[in-house]
Amino acid sequence: MTVTSLPPKSAARVRVRVNRLVLYTVLVAVTGLFLGPFGWLVLAGLKSPEELAASPVHWLPDTIQWHNFADAFHLIDFLGYARNSLVIALIYATLVTLSSAWVGFGFARLNAPGKKILFGILLGSMMLPQLITLFPTYLIFAKLGMVDTYWPWVLWGLSAAPYLVFLFRQFFAGLPRELEEAAIIDGAGYIQIFWRIFLPQSWPVLSASFIIAFTWTWGDYIAPQLLLSTDHSTLAVAVMTTYVNGAGAPVANLQAAASVMYVVPILLIFLVAQRGFVAGMSTSGLK
Amino acid sequence: MPSHAGAPPSRRRFLALSAGGAVAGAAALSGCAMQVSSGVSGSGETVTLMINPDDLTPELIKQAQKDLGVKIRTVKYDITKLIAMLTNGNPPDLVRGIGAVDAAYFAARDVAEELDPYFARSSILRLDDLDPVNDLWRYDGRTQGKGPRYGMAKDFSQDSMYWYNTALFDKTGVDYPSETEPVTYEEWLDNAERLVQRKNGQTTVFGGSYNGLGKAILLTSLTAAAGGNLFTDDFSQVDFSSPEARKALGWYIDYCRVRVGPSIIDPDPNTWDGPTYQANRMAMSNCGYWLGGLINTAPKLAEVSRLAPAPVFEGGPRISTCQGGTGLWMPRKARNKDAAWRVFEWFFGEAPAKARASGGWGIPTLKSLRSLMPAQEEHQKQVLKVQEAELKHFSVASFTPYAKWEGLESIFNQIAPAAMRGDMSVDTLARRLNSAMNEQLKRGKEQVG
């Protein structure tokens, strides 16, 4: 019997193909794992309550219940709540992106006594769970007469967010010092340097920051639930609490359909801005 | 810091832009928040209700605006928010609460308004028309069920009763329970074991679910059914070691151990019985009359659904408690009490009460509204007959004012799973529950004073 062996080039090509096949298989499996819950949510939104509770599990609906989406949309003022969510998310994302960039610039490019300690405190505040501050937060805003208004999101936006400050700080610290020095020689002050030189350079981080902040607010349940009345509340609160039957128990298929519609805006924003988002995360030194 | 002053116009421009952005964002909202279309607008007094979305539909709120000339503002019920509002001195005017477990808790802390003067002058909520279930909202400083009224139940069920699916009984050849004579808890569990269906180690049909409206109130109710009281006379301690409480606890642990129904160690992914029962995957469901609201919407399910009397313990009294009695109470510091009372009367005696009564989601709490309960279909007549007979056995199982039921339930959920899995004896469990719960009750009593 004659043993034939592949020429070295062909063997290498086969090895590359096999490696690629293994890689793609793993990637597809991981993607499936991550998309699984969302896929299940979509399927749940297309089933009847009986099918949703069936055992053995009905993976695919016998009859697709498209009307669940229409019902979920009409059962509550979906657009009204979505508008409220959008307004809050835009206010907060815009303001917090600007304020965090400003603070991040300070930490990256300016020197002052206690800067390191202040930065440590700032980072330390990221470890503080939101639940701890829930009660005093309500009391403060109630004393200021800001309960059931959107002013808390304006104030939170103007106060910068530690994680975003860190993101900007990392990015600004990586920009060449020559840029700053040239501007100083030309007579620019630090406000001008920030506004005219550093900020225009930071579009990737700006878009990453905006997306992150927008997603935080769009998905936040606790703050709107605590501070807003039902009529002024957001889609996150409405989706979580409004699809109930006469006994207050959740109607899971309508809730699932509403949840799918609820995440669509976030997915669209991410799809449109994903290049900037990825670039922002990679150029900030955070991966 | 190196000092390089910026050019004044740029600084101003930057500050103007930053401030402008902030102000524009806020001003765009008119300094306020945007409202979804609840249909509530216009002038008049405003009453704030802390309720759940299913308590009042936007249409009913709109109707209230028209009928009462009162603007109703709703906030979602949330205990953290309620405590924060009470602490801040600006509570809602009316708050949702579970009569069985909340009434004494808030009354003992002196944050609830006594409503007797309001009831005395009401022509809509007459005292002789109130169902005895409303006594859950009475508290005399020591015992629930006596003394001033602090609230009222919107509807109720006798929550130890259970529904059963005749098709699943037929399939396994188990006899239907009597419509008039209760089974014993032991018989109920035997039936559940015969009715459960499993395939490849998975439970495809639960034999029966028996979890009450919460573990703390369920065990209070089960102990009463065994002829005892879970709490000491002054409600400052639990005693799971008494023969009656031990019997009740032992039965519930047996129920969990044999895995015939959902429990902490075998949770139902649907989180409550409704969808599972609706999918013909639960032969018996420990829900009271209120589950009829769901069953009535599914004609095929209604045909095979029957309501049965609350089980009894061998040698125990025949009682049938209400573990909920959810309704509204008025905080003592409510700002708009008279307008709130008008809404209270409307909610419990007018359009919303009538809508609830005819919906089948609970028994009306005004006797005069009983005639509105669904009784057109044959199965509805059967359900009503059983329910009316059961009302004779209604009783109040008093709950402690010194702890929130969620706190006691949390302790139970932490300790009990070991006993449910057979890793701890019921006696040990009883001792550990006594120790942990009494510690919490002690702290609660210190707060009340």
Show the residue positions of the predicted features.
Chain B
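Conserved N-terminal structural module of periplasmic/extracytoplasmic solute-binding proteins
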Residues: 1-111, 121-127, 177, 314-316, ...
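Extracytoplasmic/periplasmic substrate-recognition and gating elements
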Residues: 66, 87, 250, 254-260, ...
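Short helix-initiation/N-cap motifs at beta->coil->alpha
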Residues: 75-84, 182-187, 264-278
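Hinge/lid segment of periplasmic solute-binding proteins
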Residues: 102-159, 308
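Short, solvent-exposed loop/beta-turn-alpha elements that line the ligand-binding surface or hinge
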Residues: 116-131, 178-181, 199-200, 204-209, ...
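Extracytoplasmic/periplasmic solute-binding protein
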Residues: 141-155, 160, 186-238, 282
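Long, aromatic- and glycine/proline-rich binding clefts that accommodate carbohydrate-like moieties
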Residues: 144, 308-309, 358-414, 418, ...
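Glycine-centered hinge/linker elements that transmit conformational signals in sensory
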Residues: 190-194, 234-266, 310
